[in-house]
Curated annotation (Swiss-Prot):
Keywords: Antiviral defense, Endonuclease, Hydrolase, Magnesium, Metal-binding, Nuclease. The gene is cas2-1. CDD domains: Cas2_I_II_III. It holds the Pfam family CRISPR_Cas2. It comes from Moorella thermoacetica (strain ATCC 39073 / JCM 9320). This is CRISPR-associated endoribonuclease Cas2 1.
Length: 96
């Protein structure tokens, strides 16, 4: 499944700055950054649950915001990209 994650973490304190780094790192573990606080991920159900669990452990629900959008399948049919395309095609072969 393709998901889109957006977040807004309060960085007024050092603890908030640390939470922001943790949230970004968890998102990087599962997908790719498309904007400063926006990630696209291609995950299965088990990975999705793990991702959600890890993110919820990072945030402070009293001061932070986290949104996870599940994209309609087939996602490529509904995603339109314009301009510089720096995203990775998760379904394409990986050549090293």
């Amino acid at each position: 499944m393709y998901i889109l994650i957006t977040y807004d973490v309060s960085t007024e304190t050092e603890a908030g700055k640390k939470r922001l780094r943790k949230v970004a790192q968890v998102c990087k573990d599962f997908g790719q950054r498309v904007q400063k606080s926006v990630f696209e991920c291609s995950v299965n159900e088990a990975q999705f649950e793990q991702l959600k669990h890890r993110l919820l452990q990072c945030i402070d629900e009293k001061s932070d915001s986290l949104r996870i959008y599940r994209l309609r399948e087939p996602a490529k049919k509904y995603i339109q990209e314009y301009g510089v395309n720096l995203t990775i095609d998760f379904d394409a072969p990986l050549v090293l």
